[in-house]
Every structure is written in structure tokens, then in C-alpha cells.
């Protein structure tokens, strides 16, 4: 027996509602996109290359739909009508909905200091809040050196990996002053709900510093490691690392690397490079306890010395707070964006990176102009 017109209408309305409720990364026009990547510029003298350069809110954008180079954004990070704001606004619109899972974590969490006037240099020089210059302090080493935001309904969700201190605000979109001075990176990925279990495992290894979260009971039952991570539990003992494959909504494969604080080694030299079977060129924050090149390794990591994105004037690694890497071999076109640094002090911190094999993204992120090397 066929459905009545009223029943058909109800099913159609339900379908519309479910489509509307599903979460996705958003592009620069506010449309769904499977994944995108960002390179934010440090404060530089305005050279006309990208809007907001002198104010520290200029950035370049690339996504899987356009498969091009890093494109200068006409909108600044302070604007509400750009990809990052559009993406996070989905959560903000539903922040009071207790059926929605979310977690925001940051080794320099929002609210640890006022975001109205604090600059990153002030964070780095303050013993109480610094996770960079006083790595032996208990408040620094207890949690992973990891930053991100995740939100899911029962259908799909978003994982935004980034390097920005004091970001994001848990109730509304705003880009913090702490993110102005230095370069930063971000990676947004859209996943089906089934991938949340694996993501939760990686958080369990990382032990993130969580400052906002809600985990519905039914989702907690599906995702045991996630529930433990939200509750403040973390991986103890072996194994000290976890490497997983994540499949995005559109079927793209990302490899996520997570280490616990007991890993006690560099993530890139010890885990990422040998797993991907390629040398890496890495850009991270490096101050005071840099890792020497280990040229005896089969696959090793070189460090960036200068970065040149688009037509923006090249800048030194000392002006960059990004956490990114790409393979040295373009025939193995890996790009990684994450949240942990190449510093010996980070050996005892949880953290990780997320990598994809993509020729167009490799070309887009081949922005490291000079590097140290074993020659």
C-alpha cells in the first residue's frame, strides 16, 4: 500500500531536518566541503599580497574541491564570513543542544588568560601558562601539547586541528590576539559518525587539556576511549603510540599519528617518517631545546629555516608557530598538519599530526624556502 501524501511530506521533512543537522567543514562561501587547510601569516609589513597582513589576521586557504594552491583570503580571521568561522558557527548555533558531542582542547586553553589583549610572546614568557619555554613545569607537562575542536551529531562531524593558543572561544567565534604575531596552521576534516571511535582513541593517547566538552550518554557508550579521554583518563604504559587511518565523508584517507607522554622521542623522526617511508621537512616552534639532525636514520626530518607562502614576503621560522611537515620526495606527496613541536622538551608530551598523501596539497604546502640538512 502506498504512503499517503501527508506521510510522504513527513518523511521529506525528516530528511531535510537530518541533512540540516549533519555537520561538515565549510568553505569560504559557507558551503559544505570535505576538508580544507589553512596557513596563517605572521604579522608583516603590508606588501599587498593578502588582506590583514599588518594586523596579523591574514591567511591562505586551500580545499579539496578546488585542488589548487594556497589562495590568499579576501576575508581576515577576524571576519565572520569565512571558512573557519562558518565551520565553527555550526557548533555555536547548537551549543545548548545536549544531543551534540563537542570537545575543545588546547595546551593554552581559552580562558587561561584574557584573550582581549594577550599576545603569544607574553604567553611564552609567563611561567604559569607557558608550555613552550618552561616545559618541565608540572602545569606544562601534565597534558599533551595538542590543540583542536571536534563536534559531532549522530550522523557526521568535524575535526579542526590547529596551532593557535587560546582558541577557539567556546561560545562564539572570535580570533584571539594571541594568534596574531606568528604563523599558524589549521586542518579541517569532515567524518561520518563511525570515525569518532578512532578519533577518541587518539585523544586518549594525547591526553588533551580539555576546556569545554559535552558527551551524550549514547555516544559515550559507542566510544569508550573518547569517554575516558573526556573524563581525564589517558594511555599509560605500552603501547606509547597509535597510528590510525581515518576516512573522511567523501572517502579521502588521512593517517593520524598520536603519542603518549611516555613515547619519549621525537614524533617526526621516530614515528612519522619511518611509517610514511620518506624524509620529512618540518616546520614547528623551536626554541631552546632543538632536536639535532640524525642523519644516520633511514628516514629523518629536516627543519625549516624560512617560509615563503604565495606572494607574501618570506619570513623566518622564528616568526612561525605552525606545526606542519611535507615529504622531501614529491613522488611520495605527504603533507602533515598537527600540534606538536620538534623540541627535546616535547619528548614527554602527548601530541600528534594528521597526514594525507595528496599531490596538489604537497605542491600547495611546499612553502619551506630554506632548511637545514645533512649535506
From Swiss-Prot:
Entry EC number(s): 3.1.22.1
Protein keywords: Apoptosis, Glycoprotein, Hydrolase, Signal
GO biological process terms, semicolon-separated: apoptotic DNA fragmentation; negative regulation of antimicrobial peptide production
Signal peptide: 1-21
Catalytic reactions on record: Endonucleolytic cleavage to nucleoside 3'-phosphates and 3'-phosphooligonucleotide end-products
Keyword Hydrolase: yes
GO MF assignments: deoxyribonuclease II activity
Record bears the keyword Zinc: no
Residues listed as glycosylation sites in the UniProt record: 131
Cited InterPro entries: DNase_II
TM ranges: none
Entry's Gene Ontology cellular component terms: lysosome; nucleus
Domain of life of the source: Eukaryota
Function per UniProt: Hydrolyzes DNA under acidic conditions with a preference for double-stranded DNA. Implicated in apoptosis.
UniProt similarity note: Belongs to the DNase II family.
Protein name according to UniProt: Deoxyribonuclease-2
Species for this entry: Caenorhabditis elegans
Gene: nuc-1
Amino acid at each position: 500500500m502506498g504512503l499517503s501524501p501527508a506521510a510522504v511530506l513527513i518523511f521529506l521533512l525528516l530528511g531535510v531536518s537530518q541533512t540540516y543537522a549533519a555537520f561538515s567543514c565549510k568553505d569560504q562561501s559557507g558551503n559544505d566541503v570535505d576538508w580544507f587547510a589553512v596557513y596563517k601569516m605572521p604579522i608583516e609589513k603590508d606588501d599587498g599580497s593578502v588582506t590583514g597582513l599588518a594586523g596579523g589576521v591574514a591567511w591562505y586557504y586551500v580545499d579539496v574541491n578546488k585542488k589548487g594552491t594556497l589562495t590568499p583570503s579576501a576575508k581576515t580571521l577576524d571576519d565572520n564570513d569565512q571558512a573557519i568561522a562558518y565551520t565553527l558557527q555550526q557548533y555555536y548555533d547548537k551549543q545548548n543542544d545536549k544531543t551534540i558531542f563537542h570537545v575543545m582542547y588546547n595546551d593554552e586553553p581559552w580562558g587561561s588568560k584574557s584573550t582581549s589583549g594577550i599576545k603569544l610572546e607574553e604567553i611564552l614568557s609567563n611561567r604559569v601558562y607557558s608550555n613552550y619555554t618552561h616545559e618541565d613545569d608540572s602545569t606544562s607537562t601534565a597534558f599533551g601539547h595538542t590543540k583542536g575542536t571536534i563536534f559531532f551529531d549522530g550522523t557526521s562531524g568535524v575535526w579542526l586541528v590547529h596551532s593557535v593558543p587560546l582558541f577557539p572561544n567556546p561560545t562564539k567565534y572570535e580570533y584571539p590576539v594571541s594568534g596574531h604575531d606568528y604563523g599558524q596552521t589549521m586542518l579541517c576534516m569532515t567524518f561520518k559518525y563511525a570515525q569518532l571511535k578512532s578519533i577518541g582513541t587518539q585523544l586518549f593517547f594525547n591526553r588533551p587539556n580539555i576546556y569545554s566538552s559535552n558527551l551524550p550518554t549514547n555516544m559515550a557508550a559507542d566510544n569508550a576511549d573518547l569517554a575516558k579521554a573526556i573524563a581525564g583518563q589517558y594511555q599509560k604504559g605500552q603501547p606509547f603510540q597509535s597510528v590510525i587511518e581515518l576516512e573522511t565523508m567523501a572517502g579521502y584517507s588521512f593517517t593520524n599519528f598520536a603519542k603518549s607522554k611516555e613515547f619519549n622521542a621525537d614524533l617526526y623522526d621516530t614515528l612519522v617518517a619511518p611509517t610514511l617511508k620518506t624524509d620529512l621537512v618540518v616546520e614547528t616552534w623551536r626554541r631552546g631545546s632543538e632536536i639535532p639532525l640524525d642523519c644516520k636514520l633511514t628516514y629523518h626530518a629536516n627543519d625549516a629555516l624560512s617560509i615563503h607562502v604565495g606572494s607574501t614576503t618570506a619570513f623566518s621560522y622564528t616568526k612561525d608557530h605552525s606545526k606542519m611537515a611535507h615529504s622531501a620526495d614529491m613522488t611520495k606527496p605527504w603533507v602533515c598538519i598537527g600540534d606538536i613541536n620538534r623540541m627535546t622538551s616535547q619528548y614527554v608530551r602527548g601530541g600528534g599530526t594528521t597526514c594525507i598523501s595528496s599531490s596538489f596539497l604537497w605542491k600547495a604546502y611546499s612553502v619551506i624556502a630554506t632548511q637545514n640538512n645533512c649535506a
